[in-house]
């Protein structure tokens, strides 16, 4: 089984080609293509309005020396720290929505694993993951580029992410 570090490296490669300075047309930033909501969850950012549109008009909180989106793009250590914090937060969301009840099941020939769930949540959030699971794959949301949750759940199924999830 692959390690957490391999999971992060492979996720970063899938999201941005591993480019810490990547910034896409939807406003997602860095190696892991994190948006405003992700950086709020990781404790790096506060949104002024209620709308999450990745316009970065909120306030950076200075965590790890990050005071702007440019600081974030120029700080690989902050991006790695933010991703670990965010993954732990996502795991909590997945637990809350009941996604862990599906661990070990097979949906559309794909084994449901902790790392697959985390990858699916990275792409579209825990709410979209539970829709996929509850409908046994009939509702399979995609991101703005057409990438499906199912493809992430499958691609990232074989990693040991117990440093994030703890013992299950």
Predicted regions, residues:
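Non-catalytic cell-wall polysaccharide-engagement segments
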Residues: 2-25, 37-168
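Active-site nucleophilic cysteine motif
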Residues: 29-35
């Amino acid at each position: 089984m692959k390690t957490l570090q391999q999971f992060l490296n492979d996720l970063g490669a899938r999201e941005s080609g591993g480019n810490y300075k990547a910034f896409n047309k939807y406003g997602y930033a860095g190696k892991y293509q994190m948006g405003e909501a992700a950086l709020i969850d990781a404790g790096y950012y506060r949104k002024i309005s209620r709308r999450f549109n990745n316009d970065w008009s909120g306030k950076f909180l200075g965590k790890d020396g990050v005071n702007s989106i440019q600081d974030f793009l120029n700080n690989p250590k902050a991006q790695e720290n933010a991703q670990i914090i965010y993954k732990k937060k996502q795991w909590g969301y997945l637990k809350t929505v009941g996604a862990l009840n599906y661990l070990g099941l097979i949906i559309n020939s794909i084994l449901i694993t902790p790392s697959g769930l985390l990858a699916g949540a990275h792409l579209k959030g825990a709410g979209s993951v539970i829709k996929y699971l509850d409908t046994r794959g009939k509702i399979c949301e995609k991101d703005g580029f057409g990438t499906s949750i199912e493809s992430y759940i499958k691609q990232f199924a074989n990693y040991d992410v117990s440093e994030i999830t703890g013992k299950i």
